From Swiss-Prot:
Membrane topology: Peripheral membrane protein
Superkingdom of the organism of origin: Eukaryota
Biological role stated in the UniProt entry: Plays a role in vesicular protein sorting. Required for the endosome-to-Golgi retrieval of the vacuolar protein sorting receptor vps10. Required to form proper forespore membranes.
Assembly behavior: Component of the retromer complex.
Subcellular location as annotated: Membrane
Similarity section: Belongs to the VPS35 family.
UniProt keyword annotations, A-Z: Membrane, Phosphoprotein, Protein transport, Transport
Consequence of gene disruption: Leads to sensitivity to thiabendazole and microtubule depolymerizing drugs.
One of the record's GO cellular component terms: endosome
Species this chain originates from: Schizosaccharomyces pombe (strain 972 / ATCC 24843) (Fission yeast)
Residues with the Phosphoserine modification: 316, 318, 783
Name this polypeptide is given: Vacuolar protein sorting-associated protein 35
GO BP of this protein: intracellular protein transport; retrograde transport, endosome to Golgi
Length: 836
């Protein structure tokens, strides 16, 4: 350890000494440049550059020394160019002069400084100087010194590289873009060789350290390729001259670090259009790389780049079209053609951006498969990563052509899932997550889930996953269907969808309730305009949902409700055997509700569903089915509803549904409402009995509607209900409860009197008003301690919740409002007789 510290201290000391010499020489050089003593400035700069021969420095320390000298050389080069332009000195003479420097490293740095300045002057012998500099730089073969020397050559000549063509005047002297290509390619080749040789410097035990140092220096080599990409080359030059030369050097160097980095630079530096026309060369190169190269990264990088290119160009074209349409609309003097063809909603971005003659789908897929097959030892996770990238390309660039994406799933199914040697690896968590991510891609990028169902190999890959991952994927499927709002209309689509979501349905316990609710919501997106197909879809849903066990109560109700409203469609789309189909539909509804009833924990739900079915059956004029559903609801009420509070609430629901019916025969309707009134009279609590009976009176007095000219009305039974409710109200021991019920019954009398119910006469109302007012006076003189409301539910909550108003005051106000209503109608002779 002490030896290592001593060596590091010596290297640091050597760097400090070199920097001190460079700083002193730089100050002297600047002073001589200011006084015009150019030869002395060269001498000072040369002394500073001699330190670039220091072999004791690490690459990082050498870079520090290099950057300091670059600043001095930049100042020198700027001054030289200025003196040449003002005629003080001639750069060509200076170029020959600096070649007499004693040491090769300072000599070449000075030659590059003077030569690069000369390249920027008019009438410069560009081609000659470029070739000379390239040849002279071969004189430094030390890997580190040569690498930085050529990097300096690259940076200094950037502005002076020719960009013209052979057709231009003085092309032989000024050079052409091909000369620039040759210059950069040769410099790249030599720099790469030097970079690769760095690994052989020093002892073998420091190989990993040198590899790390090489990794830090790779940008110096890659800059050559970046400069090539900035020459604005045409595709022919790139394909015929640039790329082959670069690829040749990459393959010949046989260094995995260099190969991987440089191929990645090619992918990132050159334009997308160039890549599109040289994919064969790119992927052919990937196959020829050393076995230790991570080809996955190189393939994925190219696929991702092409995907982003297609998306970017497509969005740009769409934006330009929208702007063009906006401008056209704003030009009022230009008549807009109303028959402009609308954009095809199913236009694939790839079809619009990439010319069809490129056959990009076939080319990419064949190359991907070839790369995977050429690397027999490629890890499984790397294969999945490549497949994920090509799938991402197909989905984002060709979302309306699922046949391309299906190739990926077919490959996974045949070469991964069905391979006996890989079965153990399939259960590894990282691979499971990677396959899960692949399965989620179609859900993200396909316009609707129906396109996923066209993937014949999607379900086999899905079924091969771990149950927990299948559950997560199924949950995502349901969420995407709901989010995108696209309906699935075919029976086969619905059945295939259920094959995916069955993992949610069959999961036991309460942990999946939110997901089950989403499954129920998903049912609304399974629609077919043909009611016969729709009922088959609902049957498939029922057959799958019953596998949910005790959780079936969260799923089947939506099927029942969809069936109930489907009955209306059968009326609209009547076919030859529509009556038989309606019968089967109602039988199916009854079967579904029976499944819920047998579940034992859905009694209220079953009763509500029977009532909804009965209501729809009556509306659609199917009285026999409506009667059957009401009787089923009555059976549940009689046999299973035991809680008194629940009985009261359920009875109110039954009364409400029955009151809306209009298509029963008189006998059937009379049977149902008589039974309902009987239920009201058997409620446990007196106030409930009273309320139930006076509400049931409405069943005996239906109001005529537009289509119902002869509603069911039985004045005698109305009066009987009201009188019986009065008797029960009078029997209530609590005075406040009794009074409240009396007021409510009085309002019912007013209602039926207004409806011209023959059994309700003014004498009855007058007597009830007197009796109610008498009870009110009796309460007002009673002791407050005696007024204990035993059943607050008998009072309207809106009354009792009024702040700072006592119960008695509320009842008094209620009675006054009721009687005031009748008094306002006293102009009518019928109403005035009430108060006589």
């Amino acid at each position: 350890m002490n030896g290592i510290n001593t060596a590091n201290e010596e290297i640091t000391r050597s760097l400090e000494e070199s920097l001190n010499i460079c700083k002193q020489s730089s100050r002297l050089m600047q002073r001589n440049l200011q006084t015009g003593r150019l030869m002395d400035a060269f001498r000072n700069c040369s002394i500073s550059l001699v330190e670039m021969r220091n072999s004791a420095l690490t690459p990082k320390q050498y870079y520090e020394l290099y950057m300091f000298n670059m600043e001095s050389l930049r100042l020198l080069g700027g001054t030289l160019l200025e003196t040449h332009l003002n005629g003080t000195h001639n750069l060509m003479d200076l170029y020959e002069l600096v070649q007499y420097a004693g040491s090769i490293v300072p000599r070449l740095y000075l030659m590059i400084t003077v030569g690069s300045a000369y390249l920027e002057t008019p009438n410069a012998l560009v081609r000659e100087i470029m070739n000379d500099l390239l040849d002279m730089c071969r004189g430094v073969q030390h890997p580190l010194r040569g690498l930085f020397l050529r990097h300096y050559l690259l940076t200094q000549t950037r502005k002076g590289l020719p960009l013209g063509s052979e057709d231009e005047e003085d092309a032989s002297r000024k050079g052409t873009v091909l000369d620039s290509v040759k210059f950069l390619v040769i410099n790249f080749t030599e720099m790469n060789k030097l970079w690769v040789r760095i690994q052989h410097l020093g002892p073998i035990k420091e190989f990993s350290k040198r590899t790390q140092e090489r990794n830090e220096l790779k940008v110096l080599v890659g800059l050559n390729l970046v400069r090539l990409s900035q020459l604005n080359l045409d595709i022919d030059t790139y394909r015929d001259h640039v790329l082959p030369a670069i690829i040749e050097q990459i393959i010949e160097c046989r260094d995995s670090l260099a190969q991987e980095y440089l191929v990645e630079v090619i992918c990132q530096a050159f334009s997308d259009n160039m890549h599109l026309q040289t994919l064969d060369t790119y992927f052919g190169t990937v196959i020829k790389l050393s076995p230790s190269v991570n080809v996955t990264q190189l393939v994925v990088a190219m696929l991702n780049r092409l995907t982003d290119y297609v998306q970017r160009e497509y969005e740009s074209d769409s934006s330009n079209e929208d702007e063009s349409e906006t401008v056209t609309e704003k030009l009022g003097d230009i008549k807009i053609n109303e028959e402009v063809q609308q954009k095809d909603e199913q236009e694939c971005p790839g079809d619009k951006v990439i010319p069809p003659e490129y056959a990009i789908q076939e080319v990419l897929w064949s190359h991907v498969v070839e790369v995977i097959q050429s690397r027999s030892g490629l890890p499984l996770d790397c294969i999945v990563s490549i497949l994920s990238s090509i799938l991402n390309f197909f989905l984002r660039c060709y979302p309306y052509k699922p046949q391309y994406a299906d190739r990926v799933f077919q490959y996974i199914n045949e070469h991964i899932i069905n391979q006996p040697s890989l079965r153990s690896a399939l259960h590894e968590r990282p691979l499971q997550k990677s396959l899960c991510a692949i399965l989620l891609l179609p859900l993200t990028y396909f316009p609707s889930f129906s396109y996923c169902l066209e993937l014949q190999n999607f379900l086999p890959v899905f079924n091969a996953q771990d149950p927990n991952l299948r559950y997560d994927i199924a949950r995502m499927i349901v969420q995407k269907i709901i989010e995108k709002g696209h309906s699935l209309s075919e029976l086969t689509e619905a059945q295939e969808l259920l094959g995916f979501v069955s993992v949610i349905i069959e999961k036991k316990g309460v942990d999946s309730l939110d997901d089950l609710q989403n499954v129920a919501l998903m049912v609304h997106y399974l629609n077919n305009d043909d009611p016969q197909i729709q009922i088959e879809i609902l049957r498939s849903l029922k057959d799958t949902f019953i596998k949910a066990g005790e959780n079936v109560k969260y799923l089947l109700p939506v099927v029942v409700n969809r069936c109930i409203f489907l009955a209306r469609n059968f009326r609209i789309f009547k076919c030859m055997d529509w009556a038989e189909k309606v019968r089967l539909l109602w039988e199916f509804v009854n079967t579904c509700i029976n499944v819920l009833y047998k579940n034992g924990d859905s009694l209220e739900l079953c009763l509500a569903l029977y009532l909804s079915a009965a209501e729809m059956a009556d509306q659609e004029n199917y009285p026999d089915f409506a009667y059957e559903f009401f009787t089923q609801a009555f059976s549940i009420y009689e046999e299973s509803v035991l809680d008194s509070e629940l009985q009261y609430q359920q009875l109110l629901m039954i009364i409400g549904k029955l009151q809306k019916t209009r298509n029963f025969s008189v006998d059937d309707y009379d049977t149902l409402i008589t039974k309902c009134t009987l239920y009201a009279s058997k409620l446990l609590k007196k106030p409930d009995q009273c309320c139930g009976i006076y509400l049931a009176s409405h069943l005996w007095w239906q109001v005529a509607s537009g289509e119902d000219s002869r509603p069911f009305q039985d004045p005698k039974r109305v009066l009987e209900c009201l009188q019986k409710s009065l008797k029960i109200a009078d029997a209530c021991m609590d005075q406040l409860t009794s009074l409240k019920l009396f007021i409510n019954i009085l309002e019912r009398y007013f209602y039926y009197y207004d409806q011209h119910c023959e059994s309700i006469i003014a004498k009855h109302i007058s007597g009830l008003i007197d009796l109610t007012e008498q009870n009110m006076r009796s309460i007002l003189i009673s002791s407050p301690a005696d007024l204990i409301a035993s059943d607050p539910r008998a009072y309207a909550s809106s009354i009792w919740e009024v702040a700072n108003v006592s119960v008695i005051d509320s009842l008094k106000n209620h009675l006054e409002r009721a009687t005031a209503y009748a008094e306002k109608r006293s102009e009518d002779e019928r109403w005035s007789s009430i108060f006589q």
